[in-house]
Amino acid sequence: MIQIQNVSKWYGSFQVLTDCTTQVSKGEVVVVCGPSGSGKSTLIKCVNGLEPIEKGSIIVNGTKVNDPATDLPKLRSHVGMVFQHFELFPHMSIIQNLAIGQVKVLGRSQDEAHERGMKLLDRVGIKMHANKYPGELSGGQQQRVAIARALSMDPICMLFDEPTSALDPEMITEVLDVMVELAQEGMTMMVVTHEMGFARKVAHRVIFMDHGQIVEDAPKEEFFGKPHSDRAQQFLSKILNH
């Protein structure tokens, strides 16, 4: 589904990604973790072309992302992306936020988009807030709206870039519960997160990054049980002891 091959990227003279290679199979959940500045958010943004790469290749469902001929807006309509900050339209109601992409990109009628949007809001537990505006909702509720909005486009896979890091601690669980449910339903997911409980529960594999490199790429049992690198061991001892 997602193939990342020898990907390198620079910001000016600073190399942010170095020769990264991995893949995510259909139905697989892969968690990407690592210290701040390790390149994990940059890597996931490269997957749908939000960040260009200078070297290597990324293929999503048979489409080469870094090919100049690739229609990136079309590709992104099939790849759901949920960010740290919710990126909702503040001047639109919740249901309007879910309908606009379906109508403008997928060509659905307003009625179809509304019906699909309401089903998804029900699924993430906020159907009762459909006519409210984003500013009237908590951070956790807004992030659940963002997930529902991504799902409304019927994506073939979902990318999450630290979806809980901007939330108050008590709101994190409500977002993770939705993500766990998605994973259990077989959605292909690539998730940048520090939530190791989530990784232990639903990840098939864990990728650990440091200084722009993939240091570990292992089944979760192996990663949590016996990571190969000293750097991953240090990271886990710090993050799991707090």
Task: Annotate each language-model stretch with its function.
Residues 1-220:
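ABC family nucleotide-binding domain
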Residues 211, 221-242:
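C-terminal boundary and immediately downstream tail of ABC-type ATPase nucleotide-binding domains
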